[in-house]
């Protein structure tokens, strides 16, 4: 049966998850490069495009839910671009542009999440890029923490914290409600293994901002987000 598609992949210790680009990621790719994606002949403005992105995501998620999926993850590189001053300067974004983009990210994501079933978990992975052990952007989460951690209505954040590019844990103080935070303290970009005592110490540091029972541990990103993989 169609509703068994995801259940067949699960057991007592495993939950099947469907990952996809964040609605904000899709919107950013389309609106940020109109030469590559000329949608003006279809939409009179960005608001019409955004409405269709929201409708498409909601339909896809409804179909996934009908197929038995109860865990969806949005992979999102848009927020970290806003954390990196050099990226903002290269793209010509003023402080006002950055504030507007944060709100646009938040609005499209929350519109997709609104009124979803109570037993559907929606998480997000905030990514700085992961290509052949390189990255797209750097910088701590402070510039986006209030909107991202305080107002995005996901159930959990998967965050990269494997090196100095990620900044410190202080922005986690903005995490609202009972959301979980998955600390990406284990690198997937380099072959060296972490010192377990260092990992424990960093978890204790993060627990100053988010209670320990809402913290989890993971790799910072995938081991092979593209076919080239990483240099491991």
Where are these regions (language model features)?
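Catalytic-face loop-and-helix region of soluble metabolic enzyme cores
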Residues: 143-232
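Acidic, His- and aromatic-enriched active-site or binding-groove loops in soluble protein domains
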Residues: 37-58, 90-113, 143-149
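Long, well-ordered mid-to-C-terminal structural blocks that present hydrophobic/aromatic surfaces
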Residues: 96-105, 111-164
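Conserved, mostly hydrophobic/aromatic
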Residues: 8, 64, 124, 148, ...
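Active-site-proximal loop/short-helix segments
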Residues: 19-41, 67-100, 125-132, 218-221
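Short, well-ordered coil/turn segments that N-cap beta-strands
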Residues: 12-16, 68-71, 117-122, 153-155, ...
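Short glycine/threonine-rich loop-to-helix capping motif typified by GTGT followed
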Residues: 83-98, 131-141, 169-175, 195-196, ...
């Amino acid at each position: 049966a169609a509703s068994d598609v995801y259940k067949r992949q699960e057991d007592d210790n495993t939950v099947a998850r469907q990952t996809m680009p964040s609605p904000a990621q899709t919107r950013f790719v389309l609106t940020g490069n109109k030469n590559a994606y000329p949608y003006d002949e279809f939409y009179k403005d960005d608001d019409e495009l955004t409405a269709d992105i929201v409708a498409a995501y909601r339909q896809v998620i409804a179909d996934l839910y009908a197929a038995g999926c109860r865990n969806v993850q949005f992979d999102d590189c848009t927020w970290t671009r806003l954390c990196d001053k050099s990226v903002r300067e290269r793209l010509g974004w003023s402080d006002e542009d950055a504030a507007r983009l944060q709100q646009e990210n938040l609005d499209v994501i929350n519109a997709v999440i609104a009124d979803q079933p109570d037993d559907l978990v929606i998480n997000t992975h905030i990514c700085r890029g992961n290509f052949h052990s390189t990255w797209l952007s750097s910088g701590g989460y402070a510039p986006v923490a209030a909107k991202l951690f305080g107002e995005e209505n996901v159930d959990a954040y998967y965050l990269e914290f494997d090196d100095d590019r990620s900044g410190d844990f202080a922005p986690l103080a903005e995490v609202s409600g009972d959301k979980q935070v998955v600390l990406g303290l284990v690198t997937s970009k380099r072959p060296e293994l972490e010192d377990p005592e260092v990992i424990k110490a960093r978890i204790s540091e993060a627990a100053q901002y988010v209670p320990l029972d809402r913290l989890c541990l993971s790799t910072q990103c995938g081991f092979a987000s593209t076919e080239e993989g990483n240099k491991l």
